[in-house]
Curated annotation (Swiss-Prot):
It holds the Pfam family Ribosomal_S6. The gene is rpsF. The lineage of its organism: Bacteria, Pseudomonadati, Thermodesulfobacteriota, Syntrophobacteria, Syntrophobacterales. Keywords: Ribonucleoprotein, Ribosomal protein, RNA-binding, rRNA-binding. This is Small ribosomal subunit protein bS6. Belongs to the bacterial ribosomal protein bS6 family. It comes from Syntrophobacter fumaroxidans (strain DSM 10017 / MPOB).
Amino acid sequence: MRKYETFFIIDPDLPDEVTAAVDEKIKSVVGANGGDVVSYVPWGKKKLAYPVKKRSRGLYVLMEYAGDSRLVAELERNMRLDERVLKFITVKLDDRYDPEKEAARMAANLPSFPEDEDTEEKGSAPLAREEEGIGEEAQTDEAEDKE
């Protein structure tokens, strides 16, 4: 199983009952295709960056789930056909998903991507090399003659 994240936007003008029905439909597609919903977080109504299907606002939802590529294809097919879903995007998070490790991580409240311990010790690499002579007066033969 792989872990995926789908971010989608629902029409904000829908009543709460219809929005709940869309949520349940999406979760049921994941369950019916052998997937597990890891987290489902509604972000609320927000202004869109640009109009989508003549809407300037949308109800944002972030869902993490585990499954295979057929599940992703079926979920995206259902979202494409559902007029209540304005936009969506799916991203693969992990190649291998272990439900036991995920449960332990959630219990410990750790991020799903561990930070590299070496980065704190090493610090960040300098972006550019400091070159000699930048910001300093260059000495020429003429400057020495005047003195």
